[in-house]
């Protein structure tokens, strides 16, 4: 920790700016049994959360308050308040970050590494998501209790994956707002151990609020990008996951993003942070706080040029509702801003009370023996059950994109394993990762499966050299079957780095093409979060099978070979659209519009119909027959639907109906089946009409050959409604069609009619007239 003297006009503030991680340790939990802190009401467990937090803040000097508005808060030694680092990460397992400290060996040197969210999204399994989050929070709490992490984690990333070029799409569960909304609801439920619990296990942080999905594209960078978004698109596409997270799942923290939204930097935007988030969604309970992304407060001044001075940037963010700075603008300049009268002490106190209320709820100031989570420790990290769950999650997410009955592989024999992922380890984790105890490589898994393996890398992810081709082709000629493992990795897509193309990088397709001409069965295993154009592989009859595996993490190799060998049948579905390569020439990444226009083709499966592979696509090793029950659907009346909604439930979350379909396994292989229910209309509400909209889904487990399974899909009123130009959520009368997309060209439909008058389910707050 460096001690820095900073003079701001009349006030001299001693800033404690941390230059390295500040981690908790068991002996630096606050001592409420003796010492100066014990004399404050913050240690009185009989009092309410806000009163306890306010007593601590009131005991601080102005200087101490300002010092503790940064992510690596130095605490207040005078009061016995220890340092605390608010920045811990756990996107798909406890991850390396300033607040997390892994040991070099032994206890706390690793944690369970689950698949990246993009692959978790492909499972379409809400129960699984909650189970994964429960394990992650348990392990995160263990690290926190041991002084190796904070008790809050800056996860999940719930910006819908709008454009395949975005470098951080791998961190999200996909492109569909309903899907992402359900994902985050169950994830937060698992992380915090309940919906709005009084005593959360850990605090989750939904990010990045809002309309953030650009890193560095053709010279446009996230630190200065102004996302121009219509009110309709904002309400319909960009905000629903955050509404689910804040209003419905009652997350304890939200992160505002780097970008500006319609001219106002997100962390300086009271319309976003106050009007929509805290007021309209009623996200205003004790312990609910907002952090800026790391450097986002500085961007208000340096990137967006929104204010003339950094002091103005600090005050503007604080006044807008940002409580914590992941940076140093708050601690360096709030003193100057106070001198200039740019904010009130009441506003500063409010931010700090929010932050410390969160720690009070976490039991940070309570006796260890009174806290249910303080006993969690190393014994609870990477348990056999956690490892099994990591394996299950990877298997469930894998998507079969092509198969001419080559899969499952029928014999052991000799297997040529070729490609840059053939023996990959850390590559399979994606980003925001932590060290796992082990990583099962494809090479390891192939050997364990009993194959005589001939392993040759052949090429690298983005290589142009063909020096390794001959060895790869030689190995393939000696094998009974060839498995090529490639795609993209974090050298191609990453935070701070968007793609400019969506083709296979380097010379990988050239090598695959040459392998396909040898005459041996060829299976391609495609890694990566963002999709690449697979047209040439799908059309090549000598590429016999194609799998997409995302970033499967520590169990990647074994999970993939479970699918390849038929130990488990594939049932994952693409959580995004796979666009043709030329799509990037039709619309810039900076264009935030979803609907097609005179110069744009439209985005996502709802508005674009020329996909190489559509959202929700996924093949199986068996066949399924889908049928609707023998009953009429509807008609429904808008007034009746609205009037029967429970008073204590937001009307858009109220039930519309539960639809029953019958799924019959007509093949010979036991398999899961993901039922995706889409809605279409051609006359309900104003044009243009989306091609279709996902309104519900469920994953039916282990349907045996010949078995008929009744599957229920619940649909909410909000899913039936459409978003008007002003952002209102409106239930329109008209004719509707339900479509079950089974991914294999079977689209059973059912129709119904909604009668009555238009009904507004949610009146969206209108932006200020100046925007």
Curated annotation (Swiss-Prot):
The biological processes this protein is annotated with in GO are: arabinan catabolic process; xylan catabolic process
Q: Which SMART domains match?
A: Fn3_like
Q: Which Pfam families match?
A: Fn3-like, Glyco_hydro_3, Glyco_hydro_3_C
In short, the EC number is 3.2.1.37
- A single GO molecular function, which one? xylan 1,4-beta-xylosidase activity
Its EC top class is hydrolase
Q: Which PANTHER family match?
A: BETA-D-XYLOSIDASE 5-RELATED, SUGAR HYDROLASE-RELATED
- Write the signal peptide boundaries: 1-25
The protein's job, in short, is:
Xylan 1,4-beta-xylosidase involved in the hydrolysis of xylan, a major structural heterogeneous polysaccharide found in plant biomass representing the second most abundant polysaccharide in the biosphere, after cellulose.
Recorded catalytic reaction(s): these are: Hydrolysis of (1->4)-beta-D-xylans, to remove successive D-xylose residues from the non-reducing termini
Major localization class: secreted
Q: In which pathway does it act?
A: Glycan degradation; xylan degradation
Q: Does the keyword Cytoplasm apply?
A: no
Which compartment or compartments is the protein found in? Secreted
Q: What is this protein called?
A: Probable exo-1,4-beta-xylosidase xlnD
Q: Which family does it belong to?
A: Belongs to the glycosyl hydrolase 3 family.
Glycosylated residues (UniProt)? 67, 305, 345, 423, 464
**One cellular component term from this protein's GO annotations in UniProt:** extracellular region
Active site location: 293
Q: Which keywords appear in this protein's UniProt record, sorted alphabetically?
A: Carbohydrate metabolism, Glycoprotein, Glycosidase, Hydrolase, Polysaccharide degradation, Secreted, Signal, Xylan degradation
């Amino acid at each position: 920790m460096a001690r820095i003297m900073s003079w701001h006009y009349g006030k001299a503030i001693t800033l404690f700016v941390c230059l390295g991680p500040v981690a908790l340790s068991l002996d630096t939990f606050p001592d409420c049994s003796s010492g100066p802190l014990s004399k404050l009401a913050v240690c009185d467990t009989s009092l309410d959360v806000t009163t306890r937090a306010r007593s601590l803040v009131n005991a601080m000097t102005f200087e101490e308050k300002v010092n503790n508005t940064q992510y690596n808060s130095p605490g207040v030694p005078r009061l016995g308040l220890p340092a605390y680092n608010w920045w811990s990460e756990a996107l798909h397992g406890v991850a390396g970050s300033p607040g997390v400290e892994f040991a070099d060996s032994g206890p706390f040197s690793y944690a369970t590494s689950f698949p990246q969210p993009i692959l978790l999204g492909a499972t379409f399994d809400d129960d699984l998501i909650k189970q994964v989050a429960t394990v992650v929070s348990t392990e995160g709490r263990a690290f926190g209790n041991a002084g190796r992490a904070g008790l809050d984690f800056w996860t999940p990333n719930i910006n819908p994956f709008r454009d395949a070029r975005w470098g951080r799409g791998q961190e999200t569960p996909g492109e569909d707002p309903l899907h992402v909304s359900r994902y985050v609801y169950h994830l937060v439920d698992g992380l915090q151990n309940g919906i709005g619990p009084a005593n959360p296990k850990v605090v989750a942080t939904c990010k990045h609020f809002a309309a953030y999905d650009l890193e560095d594209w053709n010279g446009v960078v996230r630190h200065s990008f102004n996302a121009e978004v219509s009110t309709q698109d904002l309400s319909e596409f960009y905000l629903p996951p955050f509404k689910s997270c804040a209003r419905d799942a009652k997350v304890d923290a939200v992160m505002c993003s780097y970008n500006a939204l319609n001219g106002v930097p997100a962390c300086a935007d009271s319309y976003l942070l106050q009007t929509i988030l805290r007021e309209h969604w009623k996200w205003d309970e004790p312990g609910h706080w907002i952090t800026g992304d790391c450097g986002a407060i500085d961007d208000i001044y340096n990137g967006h040029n929104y204010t003339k001075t950094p002091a103005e940037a600090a005050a503007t963010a604080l006044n807008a509702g940002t409580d914590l700075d992941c940076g140093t603008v708050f601690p360096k300049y709030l003193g100057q801003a106070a001198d200039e009268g740019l904010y009130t002490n009441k506003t500063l106190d409010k931010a700090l009370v929010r932050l410390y209320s969160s720690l009070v709820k976490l039991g940070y100031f309570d006796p260890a023996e009174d806290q249910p989570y303080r006993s969690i420790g190393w014994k609870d990290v990477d348990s056999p059950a956690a490892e099994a769950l990591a394996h299950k999650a990877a298997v469930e997410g894998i998507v079969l994109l092509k198969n001419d009955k080559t899969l499952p592989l029928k014999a052991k024999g000799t297997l040529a394993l070729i490609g840059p992922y053939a023996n990959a380890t850390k590559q399979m984790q994606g980003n925001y990762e932590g060290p796992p105890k082990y990583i099962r490589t494809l090479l390891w898994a192939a050997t364990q499966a009993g194959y005589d393996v001939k392993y040759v890398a052949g090429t690298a992810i983005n290589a142009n050299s063909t020096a390794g081709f001959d060895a790869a082709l030689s190995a393939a000629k000696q094998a009974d079957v060839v498995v090529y493992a490639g795609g993209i990795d974090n050298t191609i897509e990453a935070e701070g780095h968007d793609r400019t193309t969506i083709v296979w990088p380097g010379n990988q397709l050239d090598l695959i093409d040459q392998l396909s001409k040898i005459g041996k069965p060829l299976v391609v295993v495609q890694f990566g979060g963002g999709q690449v154009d697979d047209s040439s592989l799908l059309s090549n009859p000598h590429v016999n099978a194609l799998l997409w595996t995302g970033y499967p993490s520590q169990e990647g190799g074994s999970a993939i070979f479970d699918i390849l060998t038929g130990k488990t049948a594939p049932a994952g579905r693409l959580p995004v659209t796979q666009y043709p390569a030329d799509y990037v020439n039709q619309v810039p990444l900076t264009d935030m519009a979803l609907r097609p226009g005179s110069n744009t083709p439209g985005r996502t499966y709802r508005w674009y119909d020329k996909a190489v592979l559509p959202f929700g696509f996924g093949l199986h090793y068996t066949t399924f027959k889908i049928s609707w029950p023998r009953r009429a659907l509807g008609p429904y009346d808008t007034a009746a639907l609205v009037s029967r909604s429970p008073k204590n439930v937001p009307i858009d979350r109220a039930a519309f109906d539960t639809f029953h379909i019958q799924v019959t396994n007509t093949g010979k292989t036991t398999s899961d089946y993901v039922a995706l229910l889409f809605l279409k209309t051609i006359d309900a509400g104003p044009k243009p009409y989306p091609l279709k909209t996902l309104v519900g889904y469920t994953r039916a487990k282990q349907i045996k050959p010949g078995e008929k399974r009744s599957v229920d899909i619940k649909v909410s009123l909000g899913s039936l409604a459409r978003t008007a130009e002003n952002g209102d959520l409106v239930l329109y009368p008209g004719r509707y069609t339900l479509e079950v997309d089974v991914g294999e060209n079977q689209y059973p439909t059912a129709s119904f009619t909604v009668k009555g008058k238009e009904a507004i389910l949610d009146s969206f707050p209108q932006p200020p007239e100046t925007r």
